[in-house]
From Swiss-Prot:
Disulfide bonds join C455-C465, C476-C484, C855-C860. Its cofactor is Zn(2+). It is an enzyme of class 3 (hydrolase). The keyword Cytoplasm does not apply. This is Probable alpha-mannosidase At5g66150. One of its GO terms (cellular component) is vacuole. Binds 1 zinc ion per subunit. Its main location: other. Residues 1-27 form the signal peptide. Glycans are attached at N280, N287, N345, N480, N508, N541, N605, N606, N668, N780, N857. Keywords: Disulfide bond, Glycoprotein, Glycosidase, Hydrolase, Metal-binding, Signal, Vacuole, Zinc. Liberates mannose from p-nitrophenyl-alpha-D-mannoside in vitro.
């Protein structure tokens, strides 16, 4: 019998089952194929959300370049750039509306070479259609704090010319999304002057970002150059947060993301929620932007290894968001985005100056990397100058298609500019790989140099030069620690040591050459047979000990005999030319014009003055430290105390857990500790052979150089040199191994500090990538009111050329030999950070502490650094000339090659002095020749740079002229074509720069002083202040080898 209500229940169940079946039928009907509408374009009057797919692919960081490309060593990081490019191209070919941007040509060229002709043609079509866009287009995404502008230009040129040759296109957008702060030179020189329309990046100070969000000033018109002003301005897009998409819209295949589920048959159907989330996130972006366009960066580090995981989701987003209609979503690129911004006719805020220093939050200033891994930074800078000289010589003799060339060094240097390479922020094994690449490239370039010099000097060949009769021995890359076998050898029989010095600058130069020798009875002659004044300086123990350890560590050899002396002499070398010097055993009858230096170990006076020339320095005999500098010619005179200190690295404190590491500089308080007590250590004589004499201050005097040797602590030593014909002091420092303790002393950051009596009102000046100088004000930012939470680290700035302070009477200038950090923490002070050793990781991704060691067998020690900085004092307004000219000499030292041969035999078969230019011509003192490189078909890339800013010097901040006929006097010039900075397009064919409305300004473009067009008959190039001009020069090919003037 049926219970009451049972029939009613059965009827209800039937209805429910029926409804469920009906729902299932409808679900099946809605779960079929969907053609997604991805063809969206900009819609006027609507909020347009530009989706820009990208993959940020570091050219080395946690893995080496090759490991990142092929996808090996994935236990460290799952990343394979080959997979990214393979996968992206496949995805782009599936839908003509999809787009993608790629930046790093060091990776793309590797991939390109592996592709079939058919695949290459597919990619060319993708580029032509705008689906694949190259952004930046350099060899790497260069750093902006630790790179020299010449390196930045070179690596960009390398990538841009590849893109032009293979795709006949030119990048339009700078894509500097990850560097840790942004320089004014990157904006105006590697942006506007390249012909780019915009620059895009993520990292700015957290305080600056919040203010810009509130003011809707994340997008600005940036004028990075005071001299070039609005003529080199560029539209700048600062991202809302990082360079990834908004939260919830990240779709890498290996990530745990929620996919867009538009099939109602499946659990998790979420299209309505996804569209709402998209619209809401878009409005958040719109609320901090001007106009009706916002950009979403759809990608992150090494993303798109399975590109469909991204594109499938973005296809759905675009389709359903646009069906919803509240906002418009579209595939886009930075160029399309900026085109839309430009058409919108909005008025934009103005930005000047730069974006340094960068802090991503309170107590976390990214100013440590300005100095991290100083040995790598020096190697990069030294090889940069060498690369410039090697390419000049390669051009002078003509490229040897089958022999060694400079390509490998250019490739290694291009990679080294990456923002985790020269910065010193990669893992140790990756840093080792960077160094190895540089060393291999340098070795091949050295073969080019030796062969080219031998060829140029050889009198025999009339046409080309196949195999020169002479062979130079290995050049001496470890000369700074006195290791140079060519100069140390006992001269055999009637042979002399032949030293050929090449000058890559366009000016005559006089330099002091120092070589290690063992023989005290040598004579030096120049190419004219004149016996030169020279000076012997006894070899110091610090250098000898360095030599013993590092030749064993680097070369695997035990140097039994250490050289006893430095032989020092004055060398005059013509511009773009060479001179030969003959070091021979002196005859018993004649004078060798050589003076042995006098060594004074314990001065009896209260003070000791040194200086064989106009610049004098006064040292305290009691403390052993510098007290005063003055120039007897100019009258500039300051009191100055110089010492070495260390900051204790912070290991986290009550304020914040942030520690000091490879990226972050965070000292444990504001106190810097002297490396010794108030006085310099009393130590055993600094020189070999002087027994155990104790002294605080040890003086070397001679006709060419005076030196002061100081030992500040067992691990910090210094030599100060004053030259007879130079008006600056050279400080050679030796720092390390840095000892660290436990607990709160687990890291030390070493500085040198100069304390003067100058009144500087918080102001100091630092260079931007070796180019412009920018005014800095302590505890101040030009764009916002700074909340000071790190008074030391927050006042450090990057240096590539140097810094200076000034008051009403004088300027004190310091130039550096590598990228480093500098500051003026108190009025009248300059400090440079020279070395760092931190024992904790700073939680920015590298997951290693900054501890560099060098091992011999099983004995390891912390890395010792040796380097130089250069100091000058001048009357106010007169220091610019010294900074510019000396800066060029530091960047481009004399290139030296060695051989052993009979002097007369050498003279008979070789041109001992030669000039590539007209022998009566030099470049103007305000012009630098920064590129002279043979391209294909004998064409030559020529790049000239004006060295001065407007108003920097009364004589040199003017139009300067270069006569190309005299520069290339040995060849007949057929045609001169002015190019863009990266030589990827003719200057006259560059598209007109975008015009922008700027707040508070009428539309009146500035007219900086620039050079005019090159007259085809006179071939004279004009350059205005801060102008760089690039040309491709063609010659009539009558002779392969350059005609040279002989001295």
């Amino acid at each position: 019998m049926e219970k009451p209500g049972m029939s009613l229940l059965k009827g209800s169940l039937c209805v429910i089952v029926f409804l469920l079946l009906l729902s299932l039928v409808e679900s099946v009907k809605g779960g079929g194929y969907v053609k997604y509408g991805t063809e969206a374009k900009v819609v006027p009057g609507k909020l347009n959300v530009h989706l820009v797919p990208h993959s940020h692919d570091d050219v080395g960081w946690l893995k080496t370049v090759d490991q990142y490309y092929v996808g090996s060593n994935n236990r460290i990081q799952n990343a394979c750039v080959r997979n990214v490019l393979d996968s992206v191209v496949d995805s782009l070919l599936r839908d003509p509306n999809r787009k993608f941007v790629f930046a790093e040509m060091a990776f793309f060229t590797r991939w390109w070479e592996e592709q079939s002709p058919e695949r290459q043609e597919q990619v060319r079509r993708l580029v032509k259609s705008g689906q694949l866009e190259f952004v930046n287009g350099g060899w790497a995404m260069n750093d902006e704090a630790t790179c020299h502008y010449i390196d930045m230009i070179d690596q960009t040129t390398k990538g841009h010319r590849f893109i032009k040759q293979q795709f006949n296109t030119t990048p339009r957008a700078a894509w500097q999304i990850d560097p840790f702060g942004h320089s004014s030179v990157q904006a105006y020189l590697l942006g506007a002057e390249l012909g780019l329309d915009s620059v895009h990046f993520a990292r700015i100070d957290y305080q600056d970002r919040e203010k810009r969000k509130a003011e809707k000033s994340l997008e600005v018109i940036w004028r990075g150059s005071k001299t070039l002003d609005s003529s080199s301005q560029i539209f700048t897009n600062i991202f809302f947060v990082h360079y990834g998409p908004p939260t919830g819209f990240h779709y890498e295949v290996t990530d745990d993301y929620v996919p867009l589920q538009d099939n109602p048959r499946f659990d998790g159907y979420n299209i309505k929620e996804a569209v709402n989330d998209f619209v809401n996130a878009s409005l958040v972006y719109a609320n901090v932007s001007r106009g009706n366009h916002v950009m979403w960066t759809m990608g992150d580090d090494f993303q798109y290894q399975f590109a469909e995981s991204w594109f499938r989701q973005m296809d759905r987003l675009i389709h359903y968001v646009n069906k919803d209609g509240r906002v418009n979503a579209l595939y886009s690129t930075p160029s399309l985005y900026v085109d839309a911004k430009n058409v919108a006719n909005v008025t934009w805020p103005l930005k000047t100056h730069d974006f340094f220093p960068y802090a991503d939050r309170a107590y976390a200033y990214w100013t440590g990397y300005f100095t991290s891994r100083p040995a790598l930074k020096r190697y990069v800078r030294a090889l940069s100058g060498y690369y410039m000289a090697a390419r000049q010589l390669e051009f002078l003799v003509g490229k040897n298609s089958g022999g060694p060339n400079t390509y490998s060094l250019g490739d290694a240097l291009g990679i080294a500019q990456h923002h985790d390479a020269v910065t010193g922020t990669a893992k140790q094994h990756v840093t080792n790989d960077y160094m190895k690449r540089l060393a291999l490239g340098a070795s091949e370039a050295e073969a080019v140099v030796n062969s080219a010099l031998a060829c140029l000097m050889n009198k025999a060949p009339k046409g080309g030069c196949t195999k020169p009769a002479i062979a130079f021995s290995q050049q001496c890359s470890l000369m700074n620690i006195s290791y140079c076998p060519s100069t140390e050898e006992t001269l055999p029989g009637q042979k002399s040591l032949i030293l050929v010095a090449y000058n890559s600058l366009g000016w005559n130069r006089t330099e002091i050459i120092r070589i290690p020798v063992n023989d005290a009875g040598l004579s030096v002659e120049d190419s004219s047979g004149n016996t030169l004044d020279a000076q012997y300086i006894p070899m110091d123990n610090v250098t000898s000990n360095l030599r013993s350890f590092y030749t064993k560590a680097y070369l695997g050899i035990s140097s039994l005999q250490r050289p006893k002396y430095w032989l020092v002499f004055k060398a005059k070398v013509p511009p773009l030319g060479w001179n030969t010097f003959f070091i021979s055993k002196a005859s018993a009858q004649g004078s060798n014009n050589h003076k042995h230096s006098s060594v004074m170990l314990s001065p009896m006076n209260n003070t000791t003055e040194i200086g064989p020339g106009n610049l004098k320095m006064v040292f305290s005999s009691d403390s052993g430290r510098l007290e005063r500098m003055y120039n007897s010619r100019t009258g500039a005179d300051i009191k100055v105390d110089q010492n070495y200190f260390w900051y204790a690295s912070n290991v986290g404190d009550a304020k914040d857990p942030q520690v000091s590491g490879a990226y972050i500089f965070r000292p444990n308080g504001s106190l810097a500790y002297p490396v010794s007590s108030s006085k310099i250590c009393t130590v055993t004589s600094a020189f070999i052979g002087n027994g155990n004499v104790q002294s605080k201050l040890q003086i070397v005097r001679g006709p060419l150089i005076d030196e002061v040797h100081q030992q500040f602590s067992p691990w910090v030593a210094q030599v100060v040199r004053l030259y007879k014909e130079k008006e600056h002091a050279e400080f050679e420092f030796t720092i390390g191994p840095i000892s660290v303790g436990k607990g709160h002393l687990t890291g030390k950051e070493i500085i040198t500090r100069m304390v003067t009596d100058m009144t500087t009102a918080k102001e100091f000046y630092t260079d931007s990538n070796g180019r412009d100088f920018l005014k800095r004000v302590r505890d101040n930012r030009t764009d916002w009111h700074l909340e000071v939470n790190e008074p030391i680290a927050g006042n450090y700035y990057p240096l590539n050329l140097g810094m200076y302070i000034k008051d009403e009477k004088a300027e004190l200038s310091v130039l550096v030999d590598r990228a480093t950090g500098g500051a003026s923490i108190k009025d009248g002070e300059i400090e440079l950070m020279l070395h760092r050793r931190t024992s904790m990781d700073d939680s920015r991704g590298v997951e290693e502490s900054l501890v560099e060691t060098v091992c011999v067998n099983d004995t390891c020690a912390g890395l010792t650094i040796r380097g130089n900085y250069y100091v000058s004092i001048n009357k106010v307004g007169e220091g610019g000339r010294w900074r510019r000219e000396t800066g060029q000499e530091i960047y481009s030292p004399l290139l030296m090659a060695f051989a052993h041969e009979n002097k007369e035999k050498w003279k008979a078969s070789n041109t001992v002095k030669g000039y590539a230019m007209d022998h009566l011509y030099t470049l103007p003192q305000n012009i630098a020749l920064i590129t002279l490189e043979e391209l294909d078909l004998g064409n030559v890339l020529l790049r000239l740079a004006h060295l001065y800013e407007a108003g920097e010097d009364s004589d040199y901040s003017k139009i300067a002229k270069v006569e190309l006929k005299k520069l290339f006097s040995g060849k007949m010039i057929k045609e001169v074509t002015e190019m863009s900075l990266s030589a990827n397009q003719e200057k006259v064919k560059m598209k007109e720069k975008m015009k922008w409305k700027v707040e508070g300004e009428a539309e009146q473009p500035s007219s900086p002083l620039r050079g005019g067009p090159v007259d085809k008959s006179t071939l004279v190039v004009e350059l205005g202040p801060m102008e760089i001009r690039t040309f491709v020069v063609q010659f009539y090919q009558k002779q392969r080898r350059r005609k040279l003037f002989v001295g």
